[in-house]
């Protein structure tokens, strides 16, 4: 609690003093201050919120001589405004009225009940169904000389309770953040660690929050253990410091304990296949190069029936395990699902999964005591459906360890289900304040209060009949409204028959309204019964939430099993629908893909040409040549994607596939600059190449696309040659090396482990047809002009390019220029041409009649125009011959 000096309150109203105390505790956070049916913001917060949310900024009076600027949002619509602010990286403190206005002296008591930040979201309205939200803290470890030796990371998915730790090299921070993708990053005040731009909203917290000893103890307390040896975290001092800051911050935002954070996983970078930011981007795993969500590998694979499954699938794609054991277990389960008997078919299983609620996030809200009535009814209905789901699984678990494990984990917590069934109404209201949440029969007192409220109608009918008989007033009516409560209405002409015990309540133009002692007694009982029923229901609901807390571990176990089952079923559906096969694994060096296909591209086109890809101990680098648009990049990407899919545990788009160990996948594909970072296209290219050359191992898969094209021809060729040699001689990795430098096709003569392959194409007139087939050997032509023509480059430009190309080819032939490219003939053909140097030189300039013919569009010619053109062409030919041209 921040203490303000008395001078800070001088001249302020009591309510403003209350607000200023609260704001002082949340200086960098927007404070939503509850006033009646609105959340109000004041002063600078009001100005900022008005700008960000397009709210009306008002001004009401002054406090201590300062105009009070205000902006507000309705309490019933607050979630949509919170969602917008969080998306912008803002944090919001929700300040509620906790006192009773009727009994309060001075301002109603208020306090901040929670702080909504980008990394601590749990409300369904604020969360994306298919994306996890992580809060991450980072703590740098230093040696005795003050040099940074590692960075400890701790990250938490508050919605599920998943907590993870890792320690990384300082230069691996960007890669780690790209993999985790935190929504919010906690760093210490004064820390100099450079967080990559766009990595997440950055929150500075006091440096003492990262104290290692305190963090270790806080982590032990959270996990209810004496030490961290059992988790393998006892030596991760920097990560423990980060975990301490993270847990302190997360608990403060929620205003309570994190009861569902009861497990810890330590991640090791050698546990997963390494994917740096460039690789994740270039392979378009979960986001296209244009920044859209589709078409990507994730969008193709995600046919999950639950949101839990969709989130787990995303996690698997970004965390492919290096060990093939996990992949083989998953593929074994997929095979069992595909071979399931008719009564437990894959379709029937997936149909049952579609009825499953988001148990993972409901459990998180339950642990934070923020679960809503329909969360509990959804949890109840899901648990009730588990026995039938397990029956389907039990019919197909044979020889599938993963399914056996899932089946065992899906045993519903019986006591939890009994409590939910007895306590929660079949179809509860959305909010507890609306009533109708607690089931009838759960609490006798609540049932009695409800009976009083619900039986008002019959009592009024009976009273009206009795009073008509007693008074003889046939048109007497007993009614109710919110302003005056219950009353007996008598028309003006019948008032002389009114008994003495009638007391006037309201006079109208044509009638009088009365109340009797009996009606007054009932009114007090009925109105208080409704209020008491809502209060009783609120108390009972809070009791149910408390009673459910012991079942959180069981709920988390069920959620994890359901998510895994859903992903496996989605993999099986994709394998069946898209004709994919189960890959195999070997401990030997090599990759064998027969008739492989790019999974995403294949789904976008009518026909896809499948291709083989083979690596081994004697074949480590493939030099890929061929025309632009011929399919080189697609072939390279599909090889990497098929490998990644295999290690994730999916079937793959191929006739067959076998993989040896893979530790990392690198890509250097495409051209893009980094203007904000002050890096040119070529600098970006070289930076990515440097990372590959420094880190690739014999078990790495490397994709190099047209390296060296961002500088002069000779510089680029020299770099490409040297990089290819280094990858072969030093790194020894699997390499797909696409290039337009024909000189590189001589590399296999020096290194037998290199091989040439090319993407074929055929000319058709002045056009080109891409065959997209990968063949052994180098290409002999680039077809650059034909591709330019396909792209719509104007015909005059194409003609000029052809003329200059002919000139360059002639110059190259006569001067024996060492600079060659794919416009040139292959070496053997070039040698034959040089042997014929005594032959008459061929003019580089085309015949004028041919030029004229190329400009003709026959469809636009009339018969007379065609005849005139024929004479013109004859004149051109004769004139050309007369000038002595051959």
Swiss-Prot record:
Entry keyword Plastid: no
PROSITE patterns: DNA_MISMATCH_REPAIR_2
Family of the protein in this entry: Belongs to the DNA mismatch repair MutS family.
Family matches, as SUPFAM superfamilies: DNA repair protein MutS, domain I, DNA repair protein MutS, domain II, DNA repair protein MutS, domain III, P-loop containing nucleoside triphosphate hydrolases
Domain of life of the source: Bacteria
Cellular-component GO terms for this entry: cytosol
Record's keyword terms, sorted: ATP-binding, DNA damage, DNA repair, DNA-binding, Nucleotide-binding
NCBIfam families linked to this entry: mutS1, PRK05399.1
Binding site for ATP: 626-633
Gene Ontology biological process: mismatch repair
Gene symbol of the encoding locus: mutS
Functional summary from the UniProt entry: This protein is involved in the repair of mismatches in DNA. It is possible that it carries out the mismatch recognition step. This protein has a weak ATPase activity.
Native organism: Burkholderia ambifaria (strain ATCC BAA-244 / DSM 16087 / CCUG 44356 / LMG 19182 / AMMD) (Burkholderia cepacia (strain AMMD))
InterPro entries cross-referenced by the UniProt entry: DNA_mismatch_repair_MutS, DNA_mismatch_repair_MutS-lik_N, DNA_mismatch_repair_MutS/MSH, DNA_mismatch_repair_MutS_C, DNA_mismatch_repair_MutS_clamp, DNA_mismatch_repair_MutS_core, DNA_mismatch_repair_MutS_N, DNA_mismatch_repair_MutS_sf
Keyword Repeat: no
Signal peptide (from-to): none
Name assigned to this protein: DNA mismatch repair protein MutS
GO molecular function: ATP binding; ATP-dependent DNA damage sensor activity; damaged DNA binding; mismatched DNA binding
